Amino acid sequence: MDEKTKKAEEMALSLARAVAGGDEQAAIKYATWLAEQRVPLRVQVKPEVSPTQDIRLCVSVEDAYMHTVTIWLTVRPDMTVASLKDMVFLDYGFPPSLQQWVVGQRLARDQETLHSHGIRRNGDGAYLYLLSARNTSLNPQELQRQRQLRMLEDLGFKDLTLQSRGPLEPVLPKPRTNQEPGQPDAAPESPPVGWQCPGCTFINKPTRPGCEMCCRARPETYQIPASYQPDEEERARLAGEEEALRQYQQRKQQQQEGNYLQHVQLEQRSLVLNTEPTECPVCYSVLAPGEAVVLRECLHTFCRECLQGTIRNSQEAEVACPFIDSTYSCPGKLLEREIRALLSPEDYQRFLDLGVSIAENRSTLSYHCKTPDCRGWCFFEDDVNEFTCPVCTRVNCLLCKAIHEHMNCREYQDDLALRAQNDVAARQTTEMLKVMLQQGEAMHCPQCRIVVQKKDGCDWIRCTVCHTEICWVTKGPRWGPGGPGDTSGGCRCRVNGIPCHPSCQNCH
């Protein structure tokens, strides 16, 4: 489009605005110019020249990287494109010089209205393309000046220049008085102090951590000038940021102290109770807050009765969590203080006695007092030959594994051999056990060497003395030295899907 055609369109639009506004002198002026230029026009009366009701405009926004998003703007059909650019700038921070609007499949100019492009009802669409700002230098003063010029154009003042009061005569430049020949007129304007946003190129103040327009972070390589002095606005902002940081640190400290006190109070309790309604996975009872116990190690929740029954029926010193389903068996253990809080004093003492008995039976260096019904026992070493029971005070011989007071070891063993020849019942029992061992109906425990027998069922048995799990078909321990689940030793049944023996009947 050449300059003459562009000027004619601007004069035609100015004529339309002057007629719509009732400005006769301006209308005569614009009509006279158009007539002198012999510009062909088409005049059409519109029933609604300047509608003022608000409508919803659907805008598709695209940037230089082909990123697209749809937004909705509340506008009026009589708004100019310049006013629309200002609205987007105020709402989203994109300067007007970076906005390129396409309405009705053609580029829209600033002085044109939305109504002239067919934007008249809700749902009408427009397209906004955001230009790259890398080659543009923007600052607050320039943005404010451009906005004021667009507001003046909307009011009908175009190409406005300020004239001084007085006669319209050219003012001659003042002669130089105290200036040497060759001296420059004025120092060049210093560049604005601050950092340029890499996204929208807005010049921000040095102390600002993010762009005031698009909130992009300040470049890491930027250094605040050492001689820079913040103005009053910056000092107020910095003081506000310091106060907000101080309040944040104070609230964080208070929250940490509160959490610490809460953990201390919780740690001082023997049992952790539930805070929400739950269901016991064992008996399926619905439990209100405070009625169930949450295990500390695995966080599973049960009623007190089910946990008490689990502890009483446990054959191990460490009580396992009773949670189990079709795919998972919890390996967690109940803590000692949880067990003590759940049981009565009598039941807790029995539980401790069970643990002591298990520890005694599983040790190869333990010895139990031979006095009938005496509970005394000890761990012995190789250089110790006698054990004085602290319960019955009898002296046990660790070499003979018996009590033979007033006799030495040789005298006791000779007497024992003599009595064995005359004891028919003892001899018959010994012969029967030998036959059972030879025929495979019994075996020695691989841990404590007592004779154990399988009555029926699968090939898994447990020693009644040391509680060692035994594989009957291999005549050895079921698990490795690590206990249940350790397949580094034992019979290693079902490892890689292979049974431990061709005759295995499931030693689980």
Swiss-Prot record:
Residues 55-119 form the Ubiquitin-like domain. The active site is at residue 458. A zinc finger (RING-type) spans 280-330, 445-474. Zn(2+) 5 binds at residues 445, 448, 463, 466. Auto-ubiquitinated. Auto-ubiquitination leads to degradation by the proteasome. Its EC number is 2.3.2.31. Component of the LUBAC complex (linear ubiquitin chain assembly complex) which consists of SHARPIN, RBCK1 and RNF31. LUBAC has a MW of approximately 600 kDa suggesting a heteromultimeric assembly of its subunits. Interacts with beta-I-type (PRKCB1) and zeta-type protein kinase C (PRKCZ). Interacts with UBE2L3. Interacts with IREB2 only in iron-rich conditions. Associates with the TNF-R1 signaling complex (TNF-RSC) in a stimulation-dependent manner. Interacts with EYA1, TAB2, TAB3, MAP3K7 TRAF6 and RIPK1. Interacts with IRF3. This is RanBP-type and C3HC4-type zinc finger-containing protein 1.
